[in-house]
Amino acid sequence: MIGNDRWVTEIETGPVTEARPDTNAREPGDRTPAAPPAATPAATTDQLPEDRYLNRELSWLEFNARVLALAADDSMPLLERAKFLAVFASNLDEFYMVRVAGLKRRDQMGLSALSADGLTPREQLGRIGEQTQHIASRHARVFRDSVLPALGEEGIYVVTWADLDQAEREQLSTYFHEQVFPVLTPLAVDPAHPFPFVSGLSLNLAVTVRQPEDGGQHFARVKVPDNVDRFVELGGTDTDGAEGAAVHRFLPLEELIAAFLPVLFPGMEIVEHHAFRITRNADFEVEEDRDEDLLQALERELARRRFGSPVRLEVADDMTEGMLELLLRELDVHPGDVIEVPGLLDLSSLWQIYGLDRPALKDRTFVPATHPAFAERETPKSIFATLREGDVLVHHPYYSFSTSVQRFIEQAAADPNVLAIKQTLYRTSGDSPIVRALIDAAEAGKQVVALVEVKARFDEQANIRWARALEQAGVHVAYGIVGLKTHCKTALVVRREGPVIRRYCHIGTGNYNSKTARLYEDVGLLTAAPDIGADLTDLFNSLTGYSRKLSYRNLLVAPHGIRAGIIERVEREVAAHLEHGPQAGKGHIRLKMNALVDEQVTDALYRASQVGVRIEVVVRGICALRPGAEGFSENITARSILGRFLEHSRILHFRAIDEFWIGSADMMHRNLDRRVEVMAQVKDPRLTAQLDDLFESALDPATRCWELGPDGQWTASPQEGRTVRDHQVSLMERHRSP
């Protein structure tokens, strides 16, 4: 399954300076031409059109619409469709908490800086509101009209109070009085009771009650508790479901509470009740002061997060006008921030339904294979001995994280010849074996350094806990460089081998998280190459001390080196292409990433396209680049692959200059300017062949994907009736454990 903590994307914060408005027309994306057009004179940025960027906010909404398309796809296993409905909802929550909140702050402050496509914050907010209302309504309809009936056919029902018979109502009455009623707190609003604070993302009932004596009406709010299952399962299930499976009947918790409102308001007449949900601004910045403890500053800001200003109000579409006006007034919400939903609010709760033990309704179980280089034979093989023989590239989740990267750290912790372990930690699992190994290593007397990024959004509290646990065990914990997030995925092991000190390294695209490593697609390089070991030594010295090294032997490091390094390689690719003659078609750039937004990198790609370099982009989420546009991007194609696993790796290939790079950085402002990121060159021909195979599979014309047109619209590909292959399924079959 896909974890419900952070599935599909990370939301960028900071300057909102990218974009181009969306349009209504949808046209199929063009295929990569067999032969590029003839070369045209090289262009400067001034010669590129002003409308060359797509709007990054609307592009993100298009991405979430692709997630919704998976939920609407009846060829998907049914509970996987329910999962994608939950993913869509969680994604949209975070988008409003961060991106929309940032735009609202800029609008309220009167900041008039335009996005890259020339829109003001207010104009972007207007377009976001329109597009969100459309896709949120479609989201609700997919659940109500497609997934919900299909669940019923499989013996899984989400019912209303009106659907229940008397015996079921009596059963739920007992449950309500014993399990729910004690945790409810009805809050009245009158001169003695001000309007209550409504916490972000909480589900609530807005209730109007009438006094029988004088007919006076009053408002009250009832919070639906979030520590009780959202879907209350009725007991007494049988096995009349599909193929003898158990029947499950669920009642939404808010329906149960609504049925017993007279118990909460005895002696009052219930006039009306409606569900609503508010989203609050969670886009805060920690003011880092060299004289203040970062953890204390962060904890102070986390306490403020729950009190952020409202950025969205979700209501059932049957809410009365009077009730809506009251909520708008009391919650201080702009009418343009209201999303009317035709059905249940907060479908992120569908993770509960996904958790049912119905394997026939889910993806087939996949067990990652152990990489052949690390496969145990008669005796367990030392990872250090393996790396002395040559570099290893691991592709997760197809190759196991636990028997490669995790084992690398665990063996280092247990090896008496290991002198030091240094590692960056951005997001890790709650019961992290990586953190446990670091603690064991420190307790065994090794020098252990952990660079813990406590500012990883929405994981701050967990990272603070781990940082303190590591410190208590004797680990040297550092928090990086003031003003920068440390996002790179690097580990360095220093080992004594006779008279020699040897360094072993891991550089990856994904977090050191054994749980998400089963769900996220990532690549990692394990190596004993001396130049990379020397580079990582310099990098950790920079992160933990006062070193400010800007250049490295075999790495590109942000915020100073990645953008310039990539643009330099694009320009070298152009030079090699022109040297061999444009008709030879030698220039060819392939990029795989989560997001492509940065204007300088995008312009470099446009200029390469104009001289005939072929450029293929595989981007999971946001893409501000306009492919296939006449005059500047005819030789660029862009596609997006979504599926069972979250495509998370960042891989760059420059064919004419024969360079492959992997790393943690997407082409976004936050990654290139406000984070410590690392990209490493992969040189071993055995490993570059593996990366080449990955690109060939992702870019196969028959691969199931969406293709981006110059108008900013994504079109499903291949077209109906053509042969279709699934990139991820193909890789699973290739790597499936026996």
UniProtKB/Swiss-Prot annotation:
EC number: 2.7.4.1
Catalytic reaction annotation: [phosphate](n) + ATP = [phosphate](n+1) + ADP
CC cofactor: Mg(2+)
Gene Ontology cellular component annotations, sorted alphabetically: polyphosphate kinase complex
Keyword list, A-Z: ATP-binding, Kinase, Magnesium, Metal-binding, Nucleotide-binding, Phosphoprotein, Transferase
Positions with a binding annotation for Mg(2+): 427, 457
Location of the region described as Disordered in the Swiss-Prot/TrEMBL record: 1-48
Post-translational modification, as annotated: An intermediate of this reaction is the autophosphorylated ppk in which a phosphate is covalently linked to a histidine residue through a N-P bond.
Superkingdom, natural source: Bacteria
Enzyme class: transferase
Binding site for ATP: 91, 520, 620, 648
GO biological process: polyphosphate biosynthetic process
Catalytic residues of the enzyme: 487
Family: Belongs to the polyphosphate kinase 1 (PPK1) family.
Biological role stated in the UniProt entry: Catalyzes the reversible transfer of the terminal phosphate of ATP to form a long-chain polyphosphate (polyP).
The protein's name in its UniProt record: Polyphosphate kinase
Source organism of this protein record: Mycobacterium ulcerans (strain Agy99)
